[in-house]
């Protein structure tokens, strides 16, 4: 799929001039004070949640470099259709992380969506002079630059909004009411999330940043971690950029960290250095394979694989988890399945059902009535299970005798704190 010249010109204008306004509404009834500090830098409480992003005050613009094509695909046009332009990274998403590096996910079920195509084709986002970009034009650039490694791009868009977009408080319906926005505020938030995510993605042209430093996709060449890090800093105001490699030692993810001044709608992103997360790339001999290359070590995924079976033990104490997700000391631990989620992270499942985290009290539960299967982190080296960027778990009581103890995400000074360790069967 190729963008026509007229649309490309409008997108270039969109990426450079359309977002200078404090808000996108000409007849705004509400605005944010220009004296507000950047997110995660305040010393006193900012009460107006429509003008200050908290607790998710660190905005990550994340990018993919997917290069392995579907089986049998080698034609350049088909490669672009599946993997995006051959000379560009693709968008992964816009994530509101907390100031300490943890994050929330799937924050508001009432705001969840199951469709993007029809929403962006809605009359609310097309044929108006006051729109930064028409919904149909936004959809076309997303089709080109926001690609899924599963081949189902819209499912990735829906996932990114439901997991991350619903956690951005300055896009909540009450804020749109303050600004006197006509139309459906839920739809408006979705439109704004995707247009701002695409705008920031276009501002961070990783491919050209690396190319300017002499780093280009190649089957033969390799690079050092320092070379890549120094190059990426040049494209991020001298701040450290987080990057990751795949199992073949090839560069495949870039994370740009920002703080934010005011509402997300003001788009006043301030580049900051990446929070310490640790890159999995080696110090030397990092590959950056061109799109279309299939490494000799590649093995196609088995679509019928149910996940990795194992048990979940208390990492620094006695006991294990049973089938409902509770901590127990006696008998036999339950079988858990660690299942790769389609767009990153993992699901946990027992014979009772998928495991989830209750947003109100952070309790872990595994059963068929779980409304939203949680996405967990997994540290393959240590075996630890994490949630929302942290690997801390606790219980408020010790499960003596035949007692079961509910397990909660996080830590508690008055509770029993531990890690959860997945042990493969």
Curated annotation (Swiss-Prot):
CDD domains: RNase_T2_euk
Catalytic residues in the record: 92, 160, 164
Database matches in SUPFAM superfamilies: Ribonuclease Rh-like
Keywords: Cytoplasm, Disulfide bond, Endonuclease, Glycoprotein, Hydrolase, Lyase, Nuclease, Signal, Vacuole
Record GO biological process: RNA catabolic process
Assigned GO CC terms: extracellular region; vacuolar lumen
Annotated localization: Vacuole lumen; Cytoplasm
Keyword Nuclease appears in the UniProt entry: yes
Catalytic activity: a ribonucleotidyl-ribonucleotide-RNA + H2O = a 3'-end 3'-phospho-ribonucleotide-RNA + a 5'-end dephospho-ribonucleoside-RNA + H(+)
Molecular function terms from GO: ribonuclease T2 activity; RNA binding
Glycosylation sites: 42, 134
Job of this protein: Rnase which modulates cell survival under stress conditions. Released from the vacuole to the cytoplasm during stress to promote tRNA and rRNA cleavage and to activate separately a downstream pathway that promotes cell death. Involved in cell size, vacuolar morphology and growth at high temperatures and high salt concentration.
Protein name per UniProt: Ribonuclease T2-like
Gene from which this protein is expressed: RNY1
């Amino acid at each position: 799929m190729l963008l026509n010249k007229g649309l490309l010109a409008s997108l270039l204008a969109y990426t450079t001039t359309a977002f200078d306004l404090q808000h996108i509404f000409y007849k705004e009834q509400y605005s944010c004070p220009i004296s507000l500090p950047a997110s995660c830098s305040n010393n006193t409480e900012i009460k107006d949640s429509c003008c200050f992003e908290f607790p998710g005050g660190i905005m990550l613009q994340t990018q993919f470099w997917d290069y392995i094509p579907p089986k049998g695909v080698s034609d350049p046009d088909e490669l672009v259709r599946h993997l995006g332009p051959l000379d560009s990274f693709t968008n992964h998403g816009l994530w509101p992380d907390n100031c300490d590096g943890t994050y929330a996910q799937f924050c508001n079920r009432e705001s969840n969506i199951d469709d993007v195509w029809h929403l962006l084709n809605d009359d609310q986002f097309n044929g108006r002079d006051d729109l930064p970009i028409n919904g149909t034009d936004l959809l076309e650039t997303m089709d080109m630059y926001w690609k899924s490694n599963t081949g189902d791009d819209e499912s990735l868009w829906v996932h990114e909004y439901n997991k991350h977009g619903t956690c951005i408080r300055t896009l909540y319906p009450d804020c749109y009411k303050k600004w006197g926005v006509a139309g459906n505020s839920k739809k408006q938030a979705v439109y704004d999330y995707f247009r701002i995510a695409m705008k920031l993605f276009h501002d961070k042209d990783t491919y050209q940043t690396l190319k300017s430093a002499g780093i280009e996709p190649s089957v033969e060449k390799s690079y050092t971690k320092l070379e890549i890090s120094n190059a990426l800093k040049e494209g991020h105001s001298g701040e450290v950029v987080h990057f990751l490699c795949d199992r073949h030692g090839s560069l495949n993810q870039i994370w740009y960290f920002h703080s934010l001044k005011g509402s997300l709608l003001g788009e006043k992103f301030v580049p900051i250095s990446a929070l310490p997360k640790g890159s999995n790339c080696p110090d030397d001999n990092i590959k950056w394979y061109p799109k279309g290359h299939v490494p000799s070590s590649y093995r196609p995924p088995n679509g019928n694989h149910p996940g990795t079976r194992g048990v979940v033990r208390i990492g620094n104490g006695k006991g294990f988890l049973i089938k409902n997700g509770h901590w127990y000391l006696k008998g036999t631990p339950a079988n858990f399945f660690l299942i790769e989620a389609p767009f990153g992270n993992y699901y946990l499942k027992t014979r009772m059902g998928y495991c989830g985290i209750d947003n109100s009290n952070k309790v872990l539960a595994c059963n068929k009535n779980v409304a939203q299967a949680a996405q967990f982190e997994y540290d393959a080296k240590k075996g630890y299970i994490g949630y929302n960027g942290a690997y801390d778990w606790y219980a408020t009581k010790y499960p003596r005798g035949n007692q079961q103890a509910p397990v909660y995400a996080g830590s508690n000074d008055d509770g029993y704190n531990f890690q959860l360790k997945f042990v493969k069967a």
